[in-house]
Amino acid sequence: MAALDVTGGIATGKLGRDVGADEGQRGDRARMALLITGLALFFIVHLVPMRPSARAALIGGMGPGIYRGLFSLVSIAGLVLIVLGYGQMQGLGRGNPELWTPPVWIKHVVLLLMIPAMILLVAAYVPSRIRSAVGHPMLTALMIWAFAHLLANADLASLLLFGSFLVFAVVDRIAVIGRPSPGPLGSAKGGALQDMLAIAGGLGLYALILFWGHAKLTGVPLLP
């Protein structure tokens, strides 16, 4: 009888572990689905402007105000799901496996790559010669940012997140070849002062993120 009790206890324990494992796998899939849904929403709505005819048809059908409102709403919803899904997938172990092992020195490469990324990001809003030379500095900054973070993060969630942004930026950059740079600044050219403003602003933004912003936004400090 004692043997039966022991056997039954072992069977019950195994069943409990199996149920727990199944629930864990379902939770992992739900978190992954959250991230993928967010990425799909964000990029689908941002693919529409790549086809001017489709964008014009939507604006003509619903009006510019409703179009902008829906665009913003879907974009924000996608970003919220991306942040939630990516955040929940961190530290999941088997649910978010490491696909390779980044070398220790890659962190220094990433920190260097982010310097031009921040300068180009600021240059997108400054009518400088940098903006004119690059053409679409925002997309170029996005490409560098995504590529750099792919180098430093080897988990599945990071591959989905940063890989998706890299592919989107490359495709969008190809799609806008030959078009003037969008936005209120258009293709306006500036001089040395504007270049210096873009560089100084980019370096300032880089320092802010390096010493404070990244740790506050992601919980991961960049410096010891």
Show where each model-derived region lies:
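Extreme N-terminal basic, low-complexity initiation segments
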Residues: 2-11
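Short, Lys/Arg-enriched N-terminal segments with co-localized hydrophobic residues
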Residues: 14-31
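Membrane-anchoring alpha-helices and their flanking helix-loop junctions
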Residues: 27-135, 140-224
